[in-house]
Amino acid sequence: MTEKICAVDLGMPTLLEAAGAEESAALCAELGLQFVELNMNLPEYADPAHMDREKLCALREKYGVYFTLHLDERLDGCDFNPLVRNAYQETLRRALELAQEAEMPIVNLHLNHGVYFTLPGKKTDLYAERREEYLQHIDEMRRIGEEGADENTALCVENTDGFLAQEKKALDLLMKSKRWGLTLDVGHMHSAGYVDDDVYIVHSGKLRHMHLHDALLMQAGQCHLPLGEGNLDWRDSLRTAEMRHCRAVIEVKTLSALRDSVKTLREAGK
């Protein structure tokens, strides 16, 4: 196994070029990383009930790496259609069962913005219009997390392009729970112009996880860049991760970008 890069546990995302669990684990160990974030948007991991727990545990022992879980980005436990909502909530339950059985410390998810209507002169978010109903379903998600996760697993909400007003209320509710925390995607934050700084200040004690990659300021299409190819102060982000005892996924999209980022980290002494 290659020497660890820094004090922070660093991980890799699931890559299309190495999507299998064993292929990912072997690459992770080769690069000197500590974990793989399995992505449920991929068919191999879409239904956590059908993921082989024994295999994941065996890979953990074989390669000396562990796994975290990234829920389907479309997951929406607040959908107005109860069939859809219940399916997504059941997916969350199954994901938490998997996390317990495969010793996954992090289950990462997005807050789905939901549907919006474009009206003359404005855009109307339905979750904003039906805020109370939306927050009721958020509370259902909170309870699922509290019932399904133990003290070794955190459900972490990731920032994307800026939390909406009703989502900030949702975070106020979720962050009251010991089982819920925050993922800071530093590239998303940078490319969105730091619109979510207030959230991470208010809930500063809830940071549990980080997605680390370079980006260009205020350019959403230039977000998941290899470290050193944007204008983000990723060294400061790593210092934050160390200070807060967070794990960090080097969340780039290709194998070459991952190798380049690992090389940059090693050359920087991090």
Label the predicted regions:
Residues 33, 66, 154, 181, ...:
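Hydrophobic "anchor" residues on beta-strands that sit immediately upstream
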Residues 13-17, 39-43, 72-74, 112-114, ...:
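Active-site beta-loop-alpha junctions enriched in small/polar residues
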Residues 2-6, 18, 22-29, 78, ...:
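Histidine-acidic metal/acid-base catalytic patches
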Residues 45-48, 119, 123-125, 223-224:
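Short, flexible/disordered intra-domain loops and linkers
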Residues 1-94, 100-101:
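N-terminal pre-domain/capping segments
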Residues 53-74, 136-150, 177, 234-238:
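Alpha-helix-loop-beta-strand connector modules within alpha/beta enzyme cores
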